[in-house]
């Protein structure tokens, strides 16, 4: 038991990663507070599930459009220096929202514009953060570090909504914006204080025409990359839309307020933390783990869709959260391990595109389905998509296993 726990937290023995872990927990908690405030504010101002879905879409549309170039920037610029810039730019949106909200003039179109701007910064920031993990811990601990990264992401999903639910219900949305801006300032301090001598910087990509296309060709000829990416594209588009579905589930299905929404998000977060800690004890990722995680995620989505009461929904979302993080962390780790260092930024940008950038398609679809039918219908869609995606990935892995080792399989 003690040995397993030690393996789960092994990467925290590295000073830079330990410092980064702390900074990200604070920063991501602030980010979740802001996202909860944004979603509830849009729902309060418009009463529209489509508007909530559109807000989610605007946040991630830049990743879909610009993500590949964001990954190229991550391959060409020292990652710590680039993160210092993106964290500074990330402070602009919450400070602007705070000023507008305090003046009582924050309209939906203003919020949409600022959410889109934050998404543009994130199209560079997200793939850079993913690739930077390898530079802090090395290949021997990247699976553990990615899992611990998932722990802090979903720990923030518990902490942020819990604080946001209390603040919105008692004071309003303004403190959420202020605390998020402060959290980015803390992350800047964390990055600036790292011991650069302990980092393992990847080889910088050469500046040549067609570098983005070269990254796409590299993924296309590498089954260990395109199969997990294809699986995540399916599940990411149709399944990972909880930012749009959960506020509608809280409001339309269970007739609750911000505290109900926060409870649903926190339940998924608790389950995700447990799942990430279990996943962190592994040192490798197998194809069957990817397939199994997708199918289990699909089954648990269908279970959550059938929960008849709020209490049972909260219970059902916890194991769904564990399955969510197991699939995402397993795909992330497998891509990091299979990528060449000079291509890692572009590969992780493609992961970012299918994981987050697919939301502009899935977010509005889930929002529309939730409003036109029921939020449970969006969970049914997620479940079916994940099961189908897992089965397709199994078929693809079986085909690859039949190819001689010196041959390459490219998708048709």
Residue ranges of model-derived segments:
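Alpha-helical transmembrane-bundle signature of multi-pass membrane transport and export proteins
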Residues: 1-412
């Amino acid at each position: 038991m003690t040995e397993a726990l030690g393996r789960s937290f092994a990467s925290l023995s590295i000073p830079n990663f330990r410092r980064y872990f702390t900074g990200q927990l604070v920063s991501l908690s602030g980010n979740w507070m802001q996202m909860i405030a944004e979603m509830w504010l849009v729902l309060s101002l418009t009463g529209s599930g489509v508007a909530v879905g559109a807000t989610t879409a605007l946040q991630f549309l830049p990743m879909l459009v610009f993500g590949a170039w964001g990954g190229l920037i991550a391959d060409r610029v020292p990652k710590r220096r680039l993160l210092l810039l993106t964290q500074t730019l990330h402070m602009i949106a919450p400070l602007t929202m705070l000023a507008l909200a305090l003046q009582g003039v924050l309209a939906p179109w203003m919020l949409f514009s600022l959410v889109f701007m934050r998404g543009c910064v994130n199209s560079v920031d997200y793939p850079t953060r993913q690739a930077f993990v390898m530079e802090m811990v090395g290949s021997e601990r990247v699976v553990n570090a990615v899992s611990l990264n998932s722990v802090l992401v979903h720990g923030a999903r518990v902490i942020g909504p819990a604080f946001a639910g209390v603040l919105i219900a008692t004071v309003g949305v303004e403190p959420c914006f202020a605390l998020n801006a402060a959290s980015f300032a803390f992350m800047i301090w964390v990055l600036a204080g790292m011991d650069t001598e302990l980092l393992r910087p990847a080889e910088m990509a050469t500046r040549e025409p067609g570098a983005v296309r070269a990254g796409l060709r590299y993924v296309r000829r590498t089954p260990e990359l395109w199969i997990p990416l294809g699986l995540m594209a399916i599940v990411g588009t149709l399944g990972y839309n909880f930012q749009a579905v959960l506020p509608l589930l809280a409001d339309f299905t269970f007739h609750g307020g911000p505290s109900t929404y926060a409870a649903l998000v926190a339940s998924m977060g608790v389950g995700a933390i447990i799942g990430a800690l279990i996943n962190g004890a592994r040192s490798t990722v197998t194809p069957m783990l990817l397939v199994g995680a997708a199918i289990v995620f699909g089954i648990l989505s269908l279970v959550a869709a059938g929960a008849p009461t709020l209490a049972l929904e909260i219970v059902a979302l916890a194991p769904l959260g564990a399955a969510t993080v197991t699939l995402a962390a397993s795909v992330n780790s497998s891509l990091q391990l299979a990528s060449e260092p000079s291509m890692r930024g572009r590969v992780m940008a493609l992961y970012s595109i299918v994981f987050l950038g697919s939301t502009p398609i899935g977010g509005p679809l889930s929002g529309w389905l939730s409003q036109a039918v029921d939020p449970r219908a969006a969970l049914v869609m997620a479940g079916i998509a994940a099961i189908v995606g897992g089965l397709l990935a199994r078929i693809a892995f079986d085909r690859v296993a039949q190819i001689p080792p010196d041959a390459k399989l490219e998708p048709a």
